[in-house]
Amino acid sequence: MTGSLLDQLRQMTIVVADTGDIQAIEQFTPRDATTNPSLITAAAQMPQYQQIVDDTLKQARAELGPEAKAAAVATLAFDRLAVAFGLKILAIVPGRVSTEVDARLSYDTEATIEKGRSLIAQYEAAGISRERVLIKIASTWEGIRAAEILEDEGIHCNLTLLFGVHQAIACAEAGVTLISPFVGRILDWYKKETGRDYEPHEDPGVVSVTTIYNYYKKFGYQTQVMGASFRNIGEIVELAGCDLLTISPKLLEQLQATDAELVRKLDPDQAAGLEIEKIDMDQATFEKRHAEDRMASEKLDEGIKGFTNALVALEKLLADRLARLEGEVALNQAFESIFRTFDLDGDGFITREEWMGTDAVFDAIDLNHDGKITAEELGAGIGAVSKLA
């Protein structure tokens, strides 16, 4: 008997849980886990984690003082909350957790460095070795340079929002610990651009990750490849053998429920024998290739905006929760603002493209799985009552 796809995948690839839901992590027992503002936002709405949110807000208020504006307290609380969830996750997984730098700093090298140092300091103050934490940074040229400096300080980085081979090469040359190429978002772009569907073996996201993996193994780079943002288990099957794959709970369930033979598709020995041209990636070459790669440039910009929107939404939720804790009631106003932040065209629905956050969060909120989030669904998801005009 071959066993489940998930069990077989674990024999050739490190499986990472793409969620902030601690109970889901306990269910699937991954080695590592990743978080981002969208995942933290979803987890923060779950009743079982409300005490973590409340304690974090109270700590941030005490740290900044009674005169500090709620927005400032919420911003500080986000950093603290990301670490608080990270600590809970690290009590379960044997490996590492990825914690994300504010996406609004994506083009600011110095600010990214300072934020990375701050996050690591918080983990170390809680008794966690920096070896168990990856700092997630967007794969801009400025972000890659920040990661290079952090890596020199022993702070390991996960470069995210990676869509082009040029980004991957720059990360490897910078000595980054790990990259997260976004398989599903690459597929989304090509489907929209061409109007056609793709079989898993020809999926542009799968092809991109395969190319990056083979390049790394051919030239002996130590940077690990962690495929991310999957749309279906077919993509995962085609990347069996990749260093790591970060997978949402929904797809982990499908892999666990599917019994079929899993064939390894990515292999370092095979990659070493391929004929591949080596490219030196200085800033001029990076910027030229990025400008020429419309998919990568559009998806990077979109991803940064999406993570920024998720962070803004989370900060609004935290500010509202703080107001409730301090005796002010503003939940409905905050909810309306959050819904309109994501409903870009004002049609009363949030599509997956408008959401631009993590697929796991979208799927959790999209209760009827029709590809659109209504005001009622978002209201249920964040515990608010929808009273939009």
Curated annotation (Swiss-Prot):
Ranges for domain EF-hand: 330-365, 365-388
This enzyme's EC code(s): 2.2.1.2
Gene Ontology BP terms: carbohydrate metabolic process; pentose-phosphate shunt
Residues the entry annotates as binding Ca(2+) 2: 366, 368, 370, 372, 377
Locations listed in the record: Cytoplasm
Catalytic activity field: D-sedoheptulose 7-phosphate + D-glyceraldehyde 3-phosphate = D-erythrose 4-phosphate + beta-D-fructose 6-phosphate
UniProt main location, coarse: cytoplasm
Residues annotated as binding Ca(2+) 1: 343, 345, 347, 354
CDD domains cross-referenced by the UniProt entry: EFh, Transaldolase_TalAB
UniProt keywords, alphabetically: Calcium, Cytoplasm, Metal-binding, Pentose shunt, Repeat, Schiff base, Transferase
PROSITE patterns, alphabetized: EF_HAND_1 (PS00018), EF_HAND_2 (PS50222), TRANSALDOLASE_1 (PS01054), TRANSALDOLASE_2 (PS00958)
Function according to Swiss-Prot or TrEMBL: Transaldolase is important for the balance of metabolites in the pentose-phosphate pathway.
Family: Belongs to the transaldolase family. Type 1 subfamily.
Name of the protein this chain belongs to: Transaldolase
Organism per entry: Gloeobacter violaceus (strain ATCC 29082 / PCC 7421)
Lineage: Bacteria, Bacillati, Cyanobacteriota, Cyanophyceae, Gloeobacterales
Name of the encoding gene: tal
